[in-house]
Amino acid sequence: MGAAEAKAAILANKTALGIEFGSTRIKAVLVDDKNQPIASGGHEWENRYENGVWTYSLDDIWTGIQDCYQDMARDVKAKYDIELESVGAFGVSAMMHGYMPFNKKGELLVPFRTWRNNITGEASEKLMELFNYNIPQRWSIAHLYQAILNGEEHVKDIDYITTLEAYVHWKLTGKRVLGIGDAAGMFPIDTTKADYNQEMVDKFDELVAPYGFSWKLRDIMPKALVAGEDAGVLTEEGAKLLDVTGKLKAGIPMCPPEGDAGTGMVATNSVAVRTGNVSAGTSVFAMIVLEKELSRPYKEIDMVTTPSGHLVAMAHSNNCTSDLNAWVNVFKEFAEAMGMEVDMNKLFGTLYNKALEGDPDCGGLLSYCYFSGEHMTGFEEGRPLFVRSPESKFNLANFMRTNLYTCLGAMRVGLNLLFEKENVKVDRLLGHGGLFKTKGVGQQILADAVNAPVSVMATAGEGGAWGIALLASYLVNKEEGETLESFLDNKVFADQESSTLDPKPEGVAGFNVFMDSYMKGLSIERAAVESEIW
């Protein structure tokens, strides 16, 4: 779209704005009536580790979103010579989970406890037993119950507990609501009713009844909403809070606030049943939209939902490309020592493509990329390891193939539960992140690892801020009865270029051989962690 059309869309209020709080960056994306980005803004921020808790202050949150909005407004002014006064629709998203408890006066009772905190182990275990459902430590209900078990004073004064994006939305609209994708990161969801699981709500209320709190669980959680539902409008107070210059007008329709997993699914068009996406960078996770509930809970699998309320299984691994990148840097140092100019893109491309020349089973080589602990395989700490036998075929191609395979090893442990024990079917996966930057390499290896076609979009996309802008657009632009899946297929991604690679039988067989060695070799990783060398 040209500048003139974009300007016309802004003046006619045929735009949608999305703002997402990532862990290190707050990003704003403004889209036009074709759902394409026409302006953006950003603000860098960092979490703090205070009194044993990973947190962001309320001041960080508000100065951050204000600066991000101003940066986007400046972009609009620079590109189109317009002072931004309104948008057609607006949505806020953020890192999921965590714990923000407020009292009746709207005061935060303890500092925001983010998803990064692993301080709710006891509560997580007890709730999993009570509900017969996996309750990860970062979920809001685990934080609440741990605070109760700890005897924390603030619990008796709670009037509202919420997540980051629902907190911001509450202050902008006055509405205590949350998109179902992150509502599912607070408390288990009954997908047949698109609401919290009432049987489990009752069990929790019964569990904490002896403490004599004045509240019941449902009263203090945000109402769960699905994509496209009315979530209120930007109030006068909210407009002033967001735009400190006072130019932004109130009354803008707002979509349900949503978590970053949900916006990531939207931005990769992975919201339909039997589709999924794999994000592979420093960490790696797969999210697969399920046809039905799993037969039982698994500690390795997190259950969330799409913004429409379809059940999603998430297999998350803490470790992916850090060790691989470290090896690539060793080759960079070698090249520089030989007096060569090193282009990092060319170096990555050369080494990644070399991997495709390796034996499908990596010639008997084995690697663990555990920079940190890995819950999928039961490690609190990690040690990056490369191991081989004297008989292994040790060459550059097999070495690189091994280092790429192991990036997906821990995630595959979780996926095995879904594919083998639960018979989950996937028609298409979409890959995004650094592992897929070199055309056709990470993509082929993932296809072989999961034995399913893998697509990669020609453009990396705009990420979660674009995803929440699309959810805002869906709120105001959907036809009567139009599903989110249909809206994305027909009005957002219809012309999106992508390439798809099918799994190769020899690659699938080779990855399975590698995984057999990977599982058998975990005792080597255990010995490295328990040794007193590092």
Q: Where are the model-predicted features located?
A:
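Active-site core segments that coordinate phosphate-bearing ligands/cofactors
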Residues: 3-11, 17-18, 121-178, 187-214, ...
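Short beta-strand-loop/turn "lid" adjacent to the catalytic site in phosphate-handling enzymes
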Residues: 77-114, 134-136, 169-181, 185-190, ...
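Carbohydrate-associated surface elements
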Residues: 117
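N-terminal glycine/serine-rich phosphate-binding loop of ATP-dependent small-molecule kinases
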Residues: 1-109, 125-126, 157, 218, ...
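A sequence-level detector of short linear motifs
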Residues: 39-40, 110, 178, 313
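Intrinsically disordered, low-complexity sequence elements enriched in Ser/Thr/Gly/Pro
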Residues: 23-25, 114, 136, 301
